[in-house]
């Protein structure tokens, strides 16, 4: 399978699984974002696509390509989300530590779950 097709499959899997988390956490995120920017969430879909391309490439390059264990996927996801969350907390006084912790853990779960699904159903 070509690398670009693999990354596209990874990206779609990540986005699909992440949708359920973001949807279930929408009230928390809506409140947080509105408190910080003074208006409701407004999505930039192009930026979102770029984000999932980067995440898909990272998961492929550092975990799936080398057939690393699920723990490596979990740690990579946690590190990526921890960097984002702690940077947000650094710049935004009202950024919640609750979101920092929840979203950091979710990053690990998302990457491990995506790796599991891809190996189980797509032979990665």
Region spans (language model):
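Juxtamembrane/disordered regions of integral membrane proteins
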Residues: 1-124
């Amino acid at each position: 399978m070509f690398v670009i097709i693999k990354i596209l499959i990874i990206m779609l899997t990540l986005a699909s699984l992440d949708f359920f988390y973001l949807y279930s956490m929408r009230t928390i995120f809506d409140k947080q974002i509105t408190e910080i920017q003074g208006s409701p969430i407004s999505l930039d879909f192009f930026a979102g696509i770029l984000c999932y391309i980067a995440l898909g490439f990272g998961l492929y390059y550092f975990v799936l390509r080398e057939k690393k264990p699920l723990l490596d996927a979990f740690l990579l996801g946690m590190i990526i989300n921890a960097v984002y969350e702690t940077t947000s907390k650094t710049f935004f006084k009202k950024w919640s530590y609750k979101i920092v912790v929840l979203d950091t853990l979710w990053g690990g779960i998302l990457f491990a779950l995506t790796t599991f699904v891809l190996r189980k159903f797509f032979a990665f």
